[in-house]
Amino acid sequence: MVQSAPASEIAALILRGFDDYREQFREITDGARARFEQAQWQEAQRASTQRINLYEEKVAETVAGLRVGLADSELLDVERWPIIKSAYIAQIDLRLDDELAETWFNSIFCGLFSHDNISDGTMFVHTTRPSLRAHARAPYTRTYRPGGDLRQALEKIFDDYRFDVPYDDRERDLERIDALLHSNLPDWVCKDPDLAIELIGSVFYRNKGAYLVGRLFTPDEQWPLVFPLLHREGHGIQFDTVITDEAEVSIIFSFTRSYFMVDVPVPAELVAFLKRLLPGKHLAELYTSIGFYKQGKSEFYRALINHLATTDDRFVMAPGVRGMVMSVFTLPGFNTVFKIIKDRFNPSKSVDHATVIQKYQLVKNHDRVGRLADTQQFADFRFPVSKFEPECLAELLEVAPSTVVMEGDVVLIRHCWTERRMTPLNIYLENASEAQTREALNDYGLAIKQLAAANIFPGDMLLKNFGVTRHGRVVFYDYDEICYLTEVNFRYIPEPRFPEDEMSSEPWYSVGPNDVFPEEFPRFLFVDLNQRRLFAKLHGNLYDAKYWQGLQEQIREGKVIDVFPYRRQETPEQLLG
């Protein structure tokens, strides 16, 4: 029944919806340990998708409940919302996840009002929380002090983090991890009587792996520390390796990875701890990496508006070949690209606007195996005209007039995606040395293979559609033709019927909409003959339809293929049942 309600009651209803979301988020997350112990890999993938979709589902549910229970005159009077916001601040003040609660409030407000009502008076454009309140106390961690006996500390770690499934070979792993630490670190570190190991109490789960995350430190220095664990079905839990290199740990927390499942009692504390381990990571990326992608979006937006307010940076078109479906622009001093859908596509493209949006959602929900860039979707961005280079603004208005609109001295962008900026692979190769070319082309082939192992076919595999990250990894970022590998029909080109067939400009065989002929890849992918020959040596099996058909068969049999986010001795394409 629609009834009158004070601001505090509306705030309480919003917070009740948040509590429901957080409870279900924790429930899904808490199941990660059992899924790991029971080797339920497909269930883990489903849980990941379920948790991603949960936020929008619960926002919609809360908005619908407010509309049913409250009169429009109360709920949709925007002038009341500063009072509702004040009441809400009082109610979340003692919470341990208050920054997430602020973002939830913003989502509810945007579900009720158009974006032109957004202001810091009606919602949390800027946070009211103290900056990284986590400085008040340390996150839940376990600390070990080897006192010169690293092996004994490792034994205690193995005991403290044991699972309900036994270790495959505890002694073997202890010896190997001890040896790796002595190999990775300066000799004096392992002997330092003041050396300490600090590990986050909660285990990080993702796909088929579990990770212990923390640091090694002395009074003067620190190193990040990650122990990846695997469950070898039929054998037990295995400490796979140890990682102490900041760049390698950064890759594990990369924007190209799926989100971790980890118990996070106080999000700000955990993010502050991770920030100390990985100072090059932005808060947005760290929040996103542990599953709070909406909080990551809030942190990104705040960083963006602060950058625009404090610098003379102006939007320009992104370097590289212009896209047939998307138009891409960037801020030179802000490590992000902004992607909008063009009003009209190149005639060779068979997709429409709705299909493009579906493709981006597919990427959001799917295991990105370190080879697909994560994106954030935004609606109704407003920027001053003065923040655009004239050539950039003119091009955007020309190619996407339904999306980019002038409102006086403000540019309205109705819909866009943001994505980490990378160097397009084709541009990278233009300036690469022989060794860099070989490494990049090898990683390009691995990217295609690892995506295929995750049941993803990029569609358009041209070099320009892949980027190179600051760590030198090759990542796919053009999603308008992406699809599930199992939807593709990989074929061999039939033998010509007559000699004249090979000279014809038209194929002598029928071609279905999902047909792909890997034999055609070399001439489509590489203009440079040296690159073409090198890639054939590195990944020539990609030109064979049988290779792709074999992967499809394994995927249809329900096999989940290992793709590791760190270097190891075994092949990254190893199959496990």
Swiss-Prot record:
Q: Which domain of life is it from?
A: Bacteria
Q: Which GO molecular-function terms appear in the entry?
A: [isocitrate dehydrogenase (NADP+)] kinase activity; AMP binding; ATP binding; phosphoprotein phosphatase activity; protein serine/threonine kinase activity
Main localization, broad class: cytoplasm
Q: Which residues form the active site?
A: D374
What processes in GO biological process is this protein linked to?
glucose metabolic process; glyoxylate cycle; tricarboxylic acid cycle
For this protein, the record's Pfam families field holds: AceK_kinase, AceK_regulatory
Its localization reads: Cytoplasm
The EC designation for this entry is: 2.7.11.5, 3.1.3.-
Quote the cellular component terms of the Gene Ontology held in the record: cytoplasm
* Ligand binding (ATP): A318, P319, G320, V321, R322, G323, M324, K339
Reaction catalysed by this enzyme = L-seryl-[isocitrate dehydrogenase] + ATP = O-phospho-L-seryl-[isocitrate dehydrogenase] + ADP + H(+)
User: Which UniProt keyword terms apply here?
Assistant: ATP-binding, Cytoplasm, Glyoxylate bypass, Hydrolase, Kinase, Nucleotide-binding, Protein phosphatase, Serine/threonine-protein kinase, Transferase, Tricarboxylic acid cycle
Regarding protein family, the annotation reads:
Belongs to the AceK family.
Summarizing the function annotation, the protein's role is: Bifunctional enzyme which can phosphorylate or dephosphorylate isocitrate dehydrogenase (IDH) on a specific serine residue. This is a regulatory mechanism which enables bacteria to bypass the Krebs cycle via the glyoxylate shunt in response to the source of carbon. When bacteria are grown on glucose, IDH is fully active and unphosphorylated, but when grown on acetate or ethanol, the activity of IDH declines drastically concomitant with its phosphorylation.
Q: Under what name is this protein listed?
A: Isocitrate dehydrogenase kinase/phosphatase
